[in-house]
């Protein structure tokens, strides 16, 4: 019997694995947006619609995992962090899937195609947001290893490095957003005002997925200091 089994037998089923599964599902939702964004940029609306449907299904599955974890999470458990901490991370993770679904829905309903001046920049931003989410997933997946090693100094350094990577990628996404907004600002006068408003909204929502991924890492970091 390994150490993880011993922990489970002593303190009940660990909530860590369900949290990791939820983050994996959330990340798959954002990854699918990359497919959607490419299709929309090419005005391949049939392919975009398929990706949009897939995003919706993935978000629903993430929601099911979230509700299952919340319902089965004991009020107290023998972990070096609180139930509230775990629920906070869960809700932040879930916001990534929610924002992704809303963003794809907005772009699909309006058949949104960005001006050529920054269309590729938007795709680059989506890639950065996906990378940020992936880095947060890697960090969360290290949580059970931390517990098994009793928060050893070596393992903490590994996790700290992972969280630093999340922060760096999120900063890159901020820079990318600013670049797109600056380009859009220069084009505003030549574009329909309603389109401009929704372009800004789409850029903001996409950036919020990276912000949420960074918050997952930050919250994780706070949990480790308690």
Where are the regions a protein language model picked out?
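Cytosolic, long alpha-helical scaffolding segments
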Residues: 1-226
């Amino acid at each position: 019997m390994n150490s993880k089994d011993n922990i489970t037998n002593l303190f009940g089923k660990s909530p860590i694995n369900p949290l990791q599964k939820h983050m994996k599902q959330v990340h798959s939702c954002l990854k699918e947006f990359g497919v959607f964004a490419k299709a929309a940029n090419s005005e391949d609306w049939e392919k975009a619609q398929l990706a949009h449907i897939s995003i919706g299904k993935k978000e629903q599955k993430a929601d099911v995992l979230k509700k299952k974890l919340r319902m089965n999470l004991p009020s107290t458990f023998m972990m070096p962090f609180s139930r509230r901490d775990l629920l906070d991370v869960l809700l932040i993770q879930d916001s990534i899937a929610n924002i992704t679904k809303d963003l794809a829905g907005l772009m699909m309903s309006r058949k949104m195609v960005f001006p050529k001046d920054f269309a590729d920049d938007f795709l680059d931003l989506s890639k950065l947001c996906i990378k940020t989410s992936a880095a947060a997933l890697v960090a969360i997946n290290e949580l059970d290893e931390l517990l098994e090693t009793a928060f050893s100094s070596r393992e903490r350094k590994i996790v700290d490095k992972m969280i630093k990577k999340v922060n760096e990628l999120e900063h890159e996404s901020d820079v990318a957003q600013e670049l797109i907004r600056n380009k859009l600002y220069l084009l505003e006068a030549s574009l329909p005002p309603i389109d401009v408003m929704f372009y800004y909204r789409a850029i903001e929502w996409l950036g919020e997925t990276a912000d949420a991924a960074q918050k997952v890492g930050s919250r994780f970091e706070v949990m480790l200091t308690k």
